[in-house]
From Swiss-Prot:
Subcellular location: Membrane
Stretches in topological domain Extracellular: 223-234, 295-299, 353-362, 425-434
Subcellular location, principal: membrane
Sample GO molecular function, one term: signaling receptor activity
Protein name: Progestin and adipoQ receptor-like protein 1
Gene Ontology CC terms: plasma membrane
Its membrane topology: Multi-pass membrane protein
InterPro entries: AdipoR/HlyIII-related (IPR004254), PAC (IPR001610)
Length: 434
């Protein structure tokens, strides 16, 4: 990266301030989001943001105020040096009698390797070509009537990108061709993006809604009077509620922040996988507890078994390469294998109590439906169906990850209903005297 090019771009506004304005404060933030790339030779990504405070002459009724915005994430292409690009435009400064803030939106486009050009938003809509990048600059000007000080802020708005325009660390599913968020190295910008339409919108909202629903369901359940639901049952169900809320909440956070930066993605990706393991553990505990309600030894043994398997899955998910796209089938296999460990206590129960009791007393039909939904979702996720067969047609809706999320939320509610029936049946029976 050439520092002179960066300095030249960031100083563009000061060089163009020829309207008699006195610059009082000019603050620029430059963040290198992947400094390790200097050693590895990978693409360098830089984020620029700028805020300028100027004093304008009191007789500048008809003068224009120059502005520029240097807020853009600039990936360094292989074989080329990274370049910082400035954007220049004009807005009317107005009179001193007008103390109202001014707000202008400008839009720029450029071809690959070309110069940015301003698009006229007032005239005939200019259709964007496939080989062009687009950027919106949000300009806000706040003038003080008493002092004549003008505070200007510039914000570059992100646009959804095609898959091939993404940096390598954001290229997860090549069958989703368009509608991706660009890198947004700002937590506030990432969370603002949940209100926009892009490839992660469905993934974010499916688990956000599920997380909120389970949170309030848990609050209702755990605050019931003890003569309705005893404290011991509240403790047992708490494992399931905690697993569901953490799994869905961490998944929501990961998909919201998945475009922030490499390091943030690595952290929240591991938390996302940890949440899946916690949901599996939390789902097993009440089922085993009520399934072997009158038998302490198998109850303790199987709860310990699933806890150890869950911890093992968490340890495996901490491996950095575990989150890579090529390990997608292995990820699905790890969690499916952990869920299938429930076959062992099921066979035990059939041997001791029979198949009829398994369905009549343990609501096993609901657990089978839950297992089917989890396996269906995992299968769609691992094979990237349906977008594999319709590339570019499922970019926003009905992609495999959204369907997987939907299956998870529905399966969790099915499981809650099933273990509730199990608990009701067990609490209304007497354990046999042994």
């Amino acid at each position: 990266m050439n520092p002179d090019e960066v300095n030249r771009a960031l100083g563009h506004y000061l060089n163009d301030a020829d309207s008699g304005e006195l610059v009082v404060e000019d603050s620029t933030t430059v963040q290198v989001k992947n400094p390790e790339a200097r050693k590895t030779g990978d693409k360098i990504e830089v984020f620029y943001s700028r805020k300028t405070t100027v004093v304008s002459p009191t007789n500048s009724d008809d003068e224009d105020a120059d502005f520029c915005s240097d807020s853009e994430l600039l990936p360094q292409q292989e074989g080329h040096r990274s370049r910082a690009t400035s954007f220049a435009g004009r807005i009317r400064a107005g009179s001193d009698d007008e103390a109202m803030p001014k707000h202008t939106i400008l839009r720029y486009r450029r071809k690959k390797g070309g110069q940015w050009r301003e698009i006229n938003l007032q005239g005939t809509p200019d259709k964007r070509k496939d080989d062009e990048d687009e950027l919106e600059v949000d300009v806000k000007e706040d003038r003080s009537e008493q002092t004549g000080i003008v505070t200007k802020t510039y914000e570059a708005r992100w646009k959804v990108l095609k898959y091939e325009h993404l940096p390598e660390w954001l290229q997860d599913n090549e069958f989703l061709r368009h509608g991706h968020r660009p890198p947004l190295p700002s937590f506030s910008e990432c969370f603002k993006s949940i209100w926009s339409l892009h490839t992660e919108t469905g993934n974010i909202w499916t688990h956000l809604i599920g997380c909120v629903a389970f949170f309030f369901l848990a609050c209702w359940f755990l605050t019931r009077p003890d003569n309705h639901i005893q404290f011991q049952e509240k403790v047992v169900f708490s494992f399931f509620f905690a697993g569901a809320v953490l799994c869905l909440g961490l998944s929501f956070a990961f998909h919201t922040l998945s475009c922030h930066s490499v390091n943030v993605v690595k952290i929240f990706c591991k938390l996302d996988y940890m949440g899946i393991s916690l949901l599996i553990i939390g789902s097993f505990i009440p089922w085993i507890y009520y399934g072997f309600y009158c038998r302490r030894e198998p109850k303790i043994t199987y709860i310990a078994m699933v806890s150890v398997l869950g911890i093992g899955a968490i340890v495996v998910s901490l491996w950095d390469k575990f989150s890579e796209s090529r390990f997608r089938p292995i990820r699905a296999a790890v969690f499916v294998g952990m869920g299938c460990s429930g076959v062992i206590p099921t066979i035990h129960y059939i041997i001791t109590d029979g198949v009829h009791s398994l369905f009549a007393d343990n609501s096993f039909h609901w657990l089978l439906l839950m297992a089917f939904l989890y396996l269906l979702g995992a299968g769609l996720y691992a094979t990237r169906t349906p977008e594999r067969f319709f590339p570019g047609k499922c970019d926003i809706w009905f992609q495999s990850h959204q369907l997987f999320h939907t299956c998870v939320v529905i399966a969790a509610f099915v499981h809650y209903y099933g273990i509730s029936e199990m608990a009701f049946a067990r609490l209304n029976e007497q354990c046999p005297v042994r």
